[in-house]
Design a protein with these regions (language model features):
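Single conserved hydrophobic/aromatic residue that forms the stacking wall/gate
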Residues: 1-10
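Flexible, polar/low-complexity N-terminal or interdomain linker segments that lie immediately upstream
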Residues: 11-69, 74-82, 168-172
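A short secondary-structure junction signal
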Residues: 41-42, 80-85, 99-102, 126-130
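Helix-loop module immediately N-terminal to the HCX5R catalytic loop
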Residues: 57-64, 68, 85-114, 156
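Cysteine-dependent PTP/DSP-like catalytic domain, specifically the C-terminal lobe
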Residues: 100-111, 126-172
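Short, surface-exposed ligand- or partner-binding patches at beta-edge/loop junctions that are enriched
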Residues: 117
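Hydrophobic/small residue at the entry helix of a nucleotide-binding pocket
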Residues: 123
Length: 172
């Protein structure tokens, strides 16, 4: 198990474990970075503020609400292979582009209900923090991301369409 002992190093991190028939990574490298996902702004600090975490079993009800703006926070190439019904594709090439999408397309929606999701939840922590620090009032994020939703939600109840890209080349 490559992650053994990491809990001691990164106590505040919620390590996600998955079982696979093969080793998805040949080696493990740990580095401290200024930003785990790069947004390049001082207006995003999930340790101070972030969106309300919505559990997988409450997600469908939230995104079915016609007054909710549902945003896929992932990059365009990820969105193209799968997403939730009715989700907005911000058409970003990299996560840094998300700021521009918010300013150009959502700035007049600060009082609307926002529901966002990403692969495992990390980008949503940052994106929801950014939006709240920019004045959005009602921001929610899918707790554990798409991967947790797909793991826990029965197929018959799932509102997910397509595949979910994972950065080591797998799809879920």
């Amino acid at each position: 198990d490559q992650s053994r002992g990491l809990g001691d190093v990164y106590k505040r991190q919620n390590l996600k474990r998955s079982k696979y028939k093969y080793m998805p990574f040949q080696k493990l490298k740990i580095r401290n970075k200024n930003e785990i996902v790069t947004l390049r702004t001082k207006f995003a600090d999930p340790t101070k503020i972030s969106g309300k975490k919505v559990k997988y079993n409450e997600w469908n009800q939230l995104i079915k609400d016609k007054d909710t703006i549902v945003i896929d926070v992932r990059n365009e190439f990820e969105v193209k292979i799968g997403s939730f019904e009715g989700a907005i594709n911000p058409k970003t090439k990299s996560f840094t582009d998300f700021k521009s999408f918010v300013q150009k397309k959502l700035n007049k929606s600060k009082d609307k209900k926002i529901a966002m999701f990403c692969t495992g939840g990390i980008r949503c922590e940052k994106a929801s923090s950014y939006m709240m620090m920019k004045g959005f009032k009602n921001v929610a994020q899918l707790d554990g991301g798409i991967l947790k939703y797909l793991e826990k939600t029965p197929k018959k109840d799932s509102m997910w369409n397509g595949e979910c890209f994972v950065f080591d080349g797998r799809v879920s």
